[in-house]
From Swiss-Prot:
Membrane topology: Peripheral membrane protein
Protein name, entry field: Ion-translocating oxidoreductase complex subunit C
Gene designation: rsxC
Molecular function via GO: 4 iron, 4 sulfur cluster binding; electron transfer activity; metal ion binding
Sites where the protein binds [4Fe-4S] cluster 1: C377, C380, C383, C426
NCBIfam families assigned: PRK05035.1, rnfC
Cofactor: [4Fe-4S] cluster
UniProt remark on cofactor binding: Binds 2 [4Fe-4S] clusters per subunit.
E.C. designation(s): 7.-.-.-
Naturally occurring in which organism (per UniProt): Salmonella choleraesuis (strain SC-B67)
Annotated segments matching region Disordered: 536-684
């Protein structure tokens, strides 16, 4: 009994709320086998044919490409696209694509050369020898995406499933009217589809694999059962025909009774779903080594004379496919990409076929009926009864029309699958799906803007924080530099202080001259040279003009001379009580010679350098003082014995003094001399004469 219940549950199917039963209109195209379409002369390949960002271009204008060659690089969710045939890239520019508004997207335009040459293909016939990651990467790089209409990258979907997938569902329902692409593919390529399903099962390792197919496809069901006759790892489930049983959430509920939560994904309940066309593309990518360059497209409608299903190369213009099917357009002809409920009308026929294109419907005017005027909502709730997602379409309609985005979001407008069942049953002919699409687009735009604003705010706050940190660090560096200078600065400061102290010590140190020793006049000479340099610089900066020296008052000069004579007599009277320092006649002779040389040098410089004005009164006073000193020295010679003088040494020293005098005279022309003071020169000359007389007298005494 338990086995009976288990077997019953194994084949059990469930139902979902809502749904409709529109005319199927599938017999127009599912009766003829798949056929090839002649190559178009030009192909337009949009870079974005899937959910996610477009890939990075890896070709340029003028490049020759082969069929299957990658035109873009795929990283992350960026899925690459490949050349549908061999030819030359003539342009890379925006072109209108498969979109309700025919938006222009960046596309690669290729002129076919007619040879249709493939790249070198490397298939993995023994795919089980490769790792799960390698298989997923190959599927992704070969451009496989969901071919049921969503266009989600298959590799990303498999990678996101991970180890939590317990049920793999293959969607073969194909519930929308007119479309028979999957039906015909299952009839002609059932074995390849099953092989692709096994590759997916090998990657995911689920507990069960289910194929869901509607009961209005008897030929496809029989072909699958024939292929799965000896297989026990894949179960074929035939479900009643009901629209939209092919929806992902609806088919999951039919086969497993599980419902995907609001805002969630099927992987949250351990389910992953793939389309039969996707399974076939996986087989060709892994086993045959062929990127996705073509897909099955249904050409149907009363406006075409040869309806059916064809292998259409991606990038083929819609006009080329319809012309091959015998398209006979009327005056107000429309062409729908997709089905009559979920498709959209093309504004022109130069739009290319992409990976999500499963049908091109060209109905006649009678087939579609006359357009009806939109009326006001009567709140009949027919749309709510038909909604397979358990939503309230009439409320969403009012929220969308009134721009009440928050309320529309709260009523789960994101769960709308845009199946069109509500618009189909609406007695007021309200295009509800169009309102819902526009509302979802506006909500997405608002969220994107909020995200950008949040990112901009985060960047601004991060920048402000960085600037504050840099400012604090800069202030800290300045404070530390002010408190404690660097080692180099400390050394420089210490050296400067040492120099200042040394100069102060030199300035305050007295000059001591010891009798009988040669004084060190280097410091005095250096100071004199410095004063000379300052004087020359001052004269160069501020040249002075010669001016006449006015004469002094004669009465004042006479008074000063009398005062000088009185001082001289007083010094003569004191000569007897104070001992005088003995004078060396040799030194006196030398000093006299040096004084004469300086006098000659000063006379030579008198013509070139201005002479400081001499005060006659001071000169007379100094001369009187000099004579008094001379008399005092003469009086002292008789009281104290003098040191005996060697005449030969005196003669030698006199000769040396004369030689030095000549040398100084010779240097007078090349080196500028310090301006001499005439007063000092006169005093020095008088002292020299007195000392010379004293030396002569002393010599006579010694001879006697």
């Amino acid at each position: 009994m338990l086995k009976l219940f288990s077997a019953f549950r194994k084949d059990k199917i469930w139902d979902f709320d809502g749904g409709i039963h529109p005319p199927e209109m599938k017999t127009q195209s599912n009766g003829t086998p798949l056929r090839q379409v002649p190559l178009a002369p030009r192909f337009v390949i949009p870079l974005k044919q899937h959910i996610g960002a477009e890939g990075e271009l890896c070709v340029s204008v003028g490049d020759r490409v082969l069929r299957g060659q990658a035109l873009t690089r795929g990283r992350g969710r960026m899925l690459p696209v490949h050349a549908p045939t061999s030819g030359t890239v003539i342009a890379i520019a925006p072109h209108s694509t498969a979109h309700p508004s025919a938006l222009a997207e960046l596309s690669v335009i290729i002129d076919a050369d007619g040879e249709d040459r493939w790249i070198e293909r490397e298939g993995w016939s023994d795919y089980r020898a490769h790792s799960r990651e390698a298989l997923i990467e190959r599927i992704h790089q070969y451009g496989v995406a969901g071919l049921g209409g969503a266009g989600f990258p298959t590799g990303v979907k498999l990678q996101g499933g991970g180890d939590k997938i317990t049920t793999l569902i293959i969607n073969a329902a194909e519930c929308e009217p007119y479309i028979t692409a999957d039906d015909r593919l299952m009839q002609d390529c059932a074995a390849q589809i099953v092989e692709g399903i096994r590759i997916l099962a090998h990657i995911l390792q689920p507990r069960e694999v289910l194929i869901g197919i509607e009961d209005n496809k008897p030929q496809a069901i029989s072909m699958l059962r024939a292929v799965l006759a000896d297989a026990h790892d894949i179960s074929l489930r035939v479900i009643p025909t009901k629209y939209p049983s092919g929806g992902a959430k609806q088919l999951t509920q039919i086969l497993t009774e599980k419902q995907v939560p609001h805002g969630g994904r099927s992987s949250d309940i351990g389910v992953l779903m793939q389309n039969v066309g996707t399974a076939y593309a996986v087989k060709r990518a892994v086993v045959d080594g062929e990127p996705i360059t073509e897909r099955v497209v249904t050409l149907t409608g009363e406006a075409v004379s040869r309806p059916g299903n064809v292998w259409a190369r991606l990038g083929t213009p819609v006009r080329h496919l319809l012309n091959d099917a015998g398209f006979c357009p009327s005056a107000d002809q429309m062409v729908i990409m997709g089905g009559p409920l979920m498709g959209f009308t093309l504004p022109w026929l130069d739009v290319p076929v992409v990976k999500i294109t499963n049908c091109l419907l060209a109905p006649s005017v009678a087939e579609m009926g006359a357009p009806q005027e939109e009326k006001s909502c009567i709140r009949c709730s027919a749309c709510a009864d038909a909604c397979p997602a358990d939503l309230l379409p009439q409320q969403l309609y009012w929220f969308s029309k009134g721009q009440q985005h928050d309320k529309a979001t709260a009523h789960h407008i994101a769960d709308c699958i845009e199946c069109g069942a509500c618009a189909w049953v609406c007695p007021s002919n309200i295009p509800l799906v169009q309102y819902f699409r526009q509302e979802k687009a506006e909500i997405n735009a608002i969220r994107l803007e909020e995200k950008r604003a949040a990112e901009a705010k985060a960047r601004f706050e991060a920048r402000q924080a960085r600037l504050e940190r840099e400012k604090a660090a800069r202030l800290a560096r300045h404070k530390s530099a002010a408190v404690q200078p660097a080692a180099k600065d400390q050394d420089a400061i210490a050296a400067a202080l040492a120099r200042v102290k040394e100069k102060q010590a030199q300035a305050t140190q007295p000059v001591v001259i010891q009798a009988g020793s040669q004084p060190d006049n280097s410091a005095v000479i250096a100071a004199r040279e410095a004063r000379k340099a300052q004087a020359r610089a001052k004269q160069a900066a501020h040249p002075m003009a010669d001016s006449a020296i006015p004469g002094d008052d004669p009465s004042k000069a006479a008074v000063e001379a009398a005062i000088a004579r009185a001082k001289a007599r007083k010094q003569e009277q004191q000569a007897g009580s104070e001992p005088a320092e003995p004078v060396d006649p040799r030194k006196a002779a030398v000093e006299a010679a040096i004084a004469r040389a300086k006098a000659r040098k000063q006379e030579q410089q008198a013509g070139s350098e201005p002479v400081e004005a001499v005060d006659p009164r001071k000169a007379a006073v100094e001369a009187a003082i000099a004579r008094a000193k001379a008399r005092k020295q003469e009086q002292q010679t008789g009281s104290e014995p003098a040191e005996p003088i060697d005449p030969r040494k005196a003669a030698v020293e006199a000769a040396i003094a004369r030689a030095k005098a000549r040398k100084q005279e010779q240097q007078a022309g090349s080196e500028p001399a310090e301006p001499a003071d005439p007063r000092k020169a006169a005093v020095a000359a008088a002292i020299a004469r007195v000392q010379a007389k004293k030396a002569a007298q002393q010599q006579v005494v010694n001879e006697d």
